[in-house]
Design a protein with these regions (language model features):
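Acidic catalytic loop of the alpha/beta-hydrolase fold
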Residues: 268-272
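Flexible "cap/lid" loop of the alpha/beta hydrolase fold
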Residues: 162-193
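Short beta-strand/loop motif that positions the catalytic acidic residue
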Residues: 257, 263-265
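Conserved HGGG/HGGXW glycine-rich cap/lid loop of the alpha/beta-hydrolase fold
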Residues: 11-107
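Conserved hydrolase catalytic core segment
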Residues: 134-174
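Conserved alpha/beta-hydrolase catalytic His-Asp/Glu region
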Residues: 196-238
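Conserved acidic catalytic loop of the alpha/beta-hydrolase fold
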Residues: 95, 118-136
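Catalytic active-site module of serine/aspartate enzymes centered on a nucleophile-bearing elbow/loop
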Residues: 287-318
Length: 318
């Protein structure tokens, strides 16, 4: 498939496209710390067969795009300490950036972020310019769904439709549910694995908590699916978390969006519970919502047919 590097906004963005570029474009934006290989071919090919041109790309700081963040101070220090002290340091760091209820808070680190979601939205729009794409159906997962909202707010003329998947209107909203305690513990353990250089194990540990009950986590299959993702370029130290924390909550602005919008969310999402997706749907006028029962913070391959059918219907009606 055609692929390349777009030099935009003083960084490089790696991209790959599928299908006839004269067809309507679907722009796929992945979530935090995840490169575009997590949009699998099995998800992309049916969209191409339905008559769409599909573009996936690596956000800044992951994959083959420019990495602006490398290993952080806490990680470097933790490597030098005994395991028990490293675990205490990591627990302390998580307590600094979360409140008593498990909400991520705007930390000092976030206030010094090198970029925010508006910069990442500009990357996506600039990539469209580079590829000669005027408008696209914008689909984003998790943080990618947040970038999708920013495009709808700040660059509405570039979007044919919006689809935020397992996403949120923003952090720090006291009316919305928080992460589960089990996920927070899983994140701490994953961070320890990353420090020890066990990056794949770190990803596995997180996804065990993110997977819902409908399709139980299969570690062997997951590791096999993650091989191309890890080989493409996994940056566990990306600044995506800081970018989310440095960005304003969009909930009060969602009413400004006047684009066909489909919100997709699972009922067992441990990091961004269902009410985050519902808040997006409630905030954007005339939006639709697809609720995936028993699904966590994931797009299970078992639901590809159902999800893609709904997406194609959404795109064609836009």
């Amino acid at each position: 498939m055609p692929q390349g590097i777009a030099e935009v906004n003083e960084i490089n963005i790696w991209w790959e496209d599928f299908g006839d570029s004269s067809n309507p474009t679907v722009l796929l934006i992945m979530g935090a710390n995840a490169n575009c290989m997590q949009w699998p071919i099995e998800f992309i090919n049916p969209l191409v067969e339905a008559g769409f041109h599909v573009v996936r790309f690596d956000n800044r700081d992951v994959g083959k795009s420019t990495w602006l963040y490398k290993e952080g101070f806490i990680s470097k220090i933790a490597k030098l300490l005994p395991l028990s002290i490293s675990k205490y340091l990591i627990s302390f760091a998580f307590n600094v950036v979360t409140d008593d209820e498990g909400n991520f808070t705007a930390s000092e680190q976030s206030s010094k972020a090198k970029y925010d979601l508006s910069d990442m939205a500009k990357d996506a729009v600039s990539l469209m310019d580079h590829l000669g794409i005027d408008k696209a159906h914008v689909v984003g997962a998790s943080m990618g769904g947040m970038i999708t909202q920013v495009i709808g707010l700040d660059h509405p003329e570039r979007a044919l439709s919006l689809t935020p998947i397992m996403s949120s209107p923003g952090m720090g909203d006291p009316e919305l549910s928080t992460m589960t305690p089990a996920l927070i513990e899983g994140m701490k353990e994953s961070f320890m694995m990353n420090i020890q250089g066990n990056y794949e194990d770190g990803v596995v540990r997180i996804y065990k908590e993110l997977t819902g009950s409908r399709f139980p986590f299969n570690e062997e299959n997951f590791r096999e699916k993650m091989k191309p993702v890890m080989e493409h370029g996994h940056n566990p130290h990306s600044g995506h978390g800081d970018a989310v924390g440095a960005s304003p909550n969009r909930r009060s602005r969602l009413k400004e969006i006047n684009l066909p919008t489909l919100v997709i969310h699972g009922t067992e999402d441990a990091i961004l519970p269902l009410d985050h997706g519902q808040a997006i749907a409630d905030g954007i006028q005339n939006s639709q919502m697809m609720i995936m029962e028993g699904v966590g913070h994931e797009l299970p391959e078992e639901l590809n047919g159902e999800v893609i059918s709904r997406l194609v219907e959404h795109f064609k009606s836009a």
